[in-house]
Design a protein with these regions (language model features):
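Secretory targeting and sorting signals
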Residues: 1-18
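Short solvent-exposed strand-capping/beta-turn motif centered on an Asx-Ser/Thr pair
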Residues: 53-57, 70-72, 133
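A surface/secretory-pathway sequence property marking extracellular, secreted
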Residues: 64, 70-111
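Serine/threonine-enriched low-complexity regions used as flexible
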Residues: 128-166
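Ser/Thr/Gly/Pro-rich low-complexity, disordered linker/stalk segments of secreted
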Residues: 166-199
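Low-complexity, intrinsically disordered segments enriched in Ser/Thr together with acidic residues
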Residues: 105-139
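Serine/threonine-rich, low-complexity linker/repeat segments that form flexible spacers/stalks
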Residues: 18-58, 76, 166-174, 198
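Hydrophobic residues positioned within well-ordered beta-strands of beta-sheet architectures
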Residues: 46-50, 63, 122-126, 141
Length: 199
C-alpha cells in the first residue's frame, strides 16, 4: 500500500502555471498585459502578451513597440508575432533584440499594428526562457511604443512582474515547467517495486 505522503510527493512534481494579467487605460486606448506564468522556475519558457484596444474615435497606428523584460530572460528566436483580424504576422527580421527589451519596427513591415476604432484588438506576443534570475524577488516588465496619434507612450515598468523560484523539473521546460508523465510513471514504478521487495 502506498502512503499518502508518497502520493503527495508525485503530485507535487507537477507544477502548474500561475498567469498574471493587468489592464489599464490612457484615455484613448486600453492595454492588457498577460504573462503566462508569473512564478516560473529557472529553465521555464513564458509568453508575454500585450493586447491593444482603441476606446476613442479614430484608429491609432504603432510605428514601433518595445517589450521590456528582466535581463535574465532570453528571447526565444522567431517567437515574436503580431496577431490581428488578418491572423498572425512574424516580427522578425524587423526586431531589435537587446538584453532587457525587444523592439519591433512596424514602419519596415508589410503590415502595421493598428488599434482600430472600437474594432478587433491587436496583440503583440513573445516567448522568453527564464535564466539565472534572482529568486523570490519581483522582477518588473513593461512596454513602450510610438504611434501616429499619441506620440511616445512609456509604460516600461507597468508590469506585471514575475517572481522566479527554483529550477524546472524534468519536463518540457515549457510554459508550465511540469514534469513529463513518463518520468512520473517511471518514478512510481520504482517506488512500487521497492515496496514489493520489502519484508
Amino acid at each position: 500500500m502506498i502512503g499518502v505522503g508518497a502520493l503527495a510527493l508525485f503530485g507535487a512534481a507537477t507544477a502548474s502555471a500561475d498567469p498574471a494579467t493587468i489592464t489599464w487605460n490612457n484615455d484613448s486606448s486600453q492595454y492588457t498585459r498577460t504573462i503566462s506564468n508569473a512564478t516560473p522556475a529557472v529553465g521555464d519558457t513564458i509568453t508575454v502578451t500585450t493586447t491593444f484596444n482603441r476606446v476613442m474615435i479614430g484608429d491609432e497606428n504603432l510605428n514601433w513597440f518595445k517589450d521590456w523584460h528582466p535581463s535574465c530572460l532570453t528571447y526565444v528566436t522567431d517567437s515574436a508575432k503580431v496577431t490581428d483580424a488578418a491572423g498572425d504576422h512574424p516580427v522578425e527580421p524587423y526586431l531589435e533584440i537587446k538584453p532587457d527589451f525587444i523592439a519591433g519596427d512596424f514602419t519596415a513591415t508589410s503590415y502595421r499594428v493598428v488599434m482600430k476604432d472600437h474594432g478587433p484588438a491587436a496583440r503583440f506576443s513573445a516567448k522568453y526562457t527564464v535564466g539565472s534570475c534572482a529568486t523570490g524577488t519581483a522582477l518588473n516588465t513593461g512596454m513602450e511604443y510610438m504611434s501616429n496619434t499619441a506620440g511616445h507612450v512609456d509604460f516600461s515598468t507597468k508590469g506585471p512582474s514575475i517572481t522566479v523560484g527554483g529550477t524546472s523539473g524534468p519536463g518540457t521546460g515549457g510554459d508550465t515547467g511540469s514534469s513529463s508523465p513518463t518520468s512520473l510513471l517511471g518514478g512510481l514504478t520504482s517506488l512500487l517495486g521497492g515496496l514489493g521487495s520489502s519484508k
